[in-house]
């Protein structure tokens, strides 16, 4: 773990997460706040169109930034994704901690910038997540769990290096998963599925009402996604003890599929 801490590539990855998170939050939440501006009285027809625009903004920004910095940091841009990859034994504990810190600080910085730019907006929530009227904490938690589960499941499947059937754009697939989560959750919770993004808005607005939902829900969803993918859908035959070593060493071994039958159980072995 100490050796990873000393590597320039490690710190470049942390900086990439920080900068990409600033761009992600600024673009995504900025698109949502734009609906409050009476620019030439240009208002959309209804809430449904608003939801589609915001969902696409969040999804496309993730896809764009994943393509931009994915080769540097992996472009997690979400503590729930980072936790999922940690539990999947693909990153070290040190990297996970530093990524989550970078993501949270980046979200705060981006939201602070937005606060200055949109200071004239009345009742400016800065995209703060909150439960919709009639939605209780249990329901909101369930929505956040499901929305994050499908996202982290998509990340695990799309980045699985054992697969030989992958085609198209991985970043786009993940971005569409983010958009899908927003189409589901916006009307219930404002759609968190990203604790750092929720944290930034709560910090700047000094409002932490029901904020725990937007950490606990995504973390449970991310953990469930790992359980489902790594132990049920695509089990790994490599020794769990060896995989857990990644938590301290930060080294991920390359694996290949064992067997040509696409319907057979996925097996892994070091190259």
UniProtKB/Swiss-Prot annotation:
Subcellular locations according to the entry: Cell membrane
InterPro entries named among the record's database cross-references: Aquaporin-like (IPR023271), Aquaporin_1 (IPR023274), Aquaporin_transptr (IPR034294), MIP (IPR000425), MIP_CS (IPR022357)
Top-rank taxon: Eukaryota
NPA 2 (motif): residue ranges: 194-196
Modified residues (Phosphoserine): 249, 264
Entry keyword Glycosyltransferase: no
Sites where a glycan is attached: 42
A GO molecular-function descriptor: water channel activity
UniProt record, GO biological process: ammonium transmembrane transport; camera-type eye morphogenesis; carbon dioxide transmembrane transport; carbon dioxide transport; cell volume homeostasis; cellular homeostasis; cellular hyperosmotic response; cellular response to cAMP
Catalytic activity: H2O(in) = H2O(out); nitric oxide(out) = nitric oxide(in); CO2(out) = CO2(in); glycerol(in) = glycerol(out)
Protein's UniProt keywords contain Repeat: yes
Principal subcellular localization: membrane
SUPFAM superfamilies assigned: Aquaporin-like
Transmembrane regions: 12-29, 49-67, 93-111, 136-155, 166-183, 209-226
Membrane topology note: Multi-pass membrane protein
Subunit structure: Homotetramer; each monomer provides an independent water pore. Component of the ankyrin-1 complex in the erythrocyte, composed of ANK1, RHCE, RHAG, SLC4A1, EPB42, GYPA, GYPB and AQP1. Interacts with EPHB2; involved in endolymph production in the inner ear. Identified in a complex with STOM. Interacts (via the N-terminal) with ANK1 (via ANK 1-5 repeats). Interacts (via the C-terminal) with EPB42.
Domain-related comment: Aquaporins contain two tandem repeats each containing three membrane-spanning domains and a pore-forming loop with the signature motif Asn-Pro-Ala (NPA).
Annotated function: Forms a water channel that facilitates the transport of water across cell membranes, playing a crucial role in water homeostasis in various tissues. Could also be permeable to small solutes including hydrogen peroxide, glycerol and gases such as amonnia (NH3), nitric oxide (NO) and carbon dioxide (CO2). Recruited to the ankyrin-1 complex, a multiprotein complex of the erythrocyte membrane, it could be part of a CO2 metabolon, linking facilitated diffusion of CO2 across the membrane, anion exchange of Cl(-)/HCO3(-) and interconversion of dissolved CO2 and carbonic acid in the cytosol.
Protein name as it appears in the record: Aquaporin-1
Species assigned in the record: Canis lupus familiaris (Dog)
Species classification: Eukaryota, Metazoa, Chordata, Craniata, Vertebrata
Gene that this polypeptide is encoded by: AQP1
């Amino acid at each position: 773990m100490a050796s990873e801490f000393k590597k320039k590539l490690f710190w470049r990855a942390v900086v990439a997460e920080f900068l990409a998170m600033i761009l992600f939050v600024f673009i995504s939440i900025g698109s949502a706040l734009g609906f409050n501006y009476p620019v030439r009285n240009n208002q959309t027809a209804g809430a449904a169109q608003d939801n589609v625009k915001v969902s696409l903004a969040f999804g496309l920004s993730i896809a764009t930034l994943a393509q931009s910095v994915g080769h540097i940091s992996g472009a997690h841009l979400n503590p729930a994704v980072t936790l999922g990859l940690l539990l999947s034994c693909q990153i070290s504990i040190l990297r996970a901690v530093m990524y989550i810190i970078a993501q949270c600080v980046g979200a705060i910085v981006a939201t602070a910038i937005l606060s200055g730019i949109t200071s004239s907006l009345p009742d400016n929530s800065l995209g703060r997540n909150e439960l919709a009227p009639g939605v209780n904490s249990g329901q909101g938690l369930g929505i956040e769990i499901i929305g994050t589960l499908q996202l982290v499941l998509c990340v695990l499947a799309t980045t699985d290096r054992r697969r030989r059937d992958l085609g198209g754009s991985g970043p786009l697939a993940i971005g569409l998963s983010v958009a899908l989560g927003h189409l589901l959750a916006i009307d219930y919770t404002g759609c968190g599925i990203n604790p750092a993004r929720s944290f930034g808005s709560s910090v700047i607005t000094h409002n932490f009402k029901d904020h725990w939902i937007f950490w606990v829900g995504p973390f449970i969803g991310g953990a469930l996604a790992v359980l489902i993918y790594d132990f049920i859908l695509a089990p790994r035959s490599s020794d769990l003890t060896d995989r857990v070593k990644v938590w301290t060493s930060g080294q991920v071994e390359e694996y290949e599929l064992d067997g040509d039958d696409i319907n057979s159980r996925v097996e892994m072995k070091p190259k």
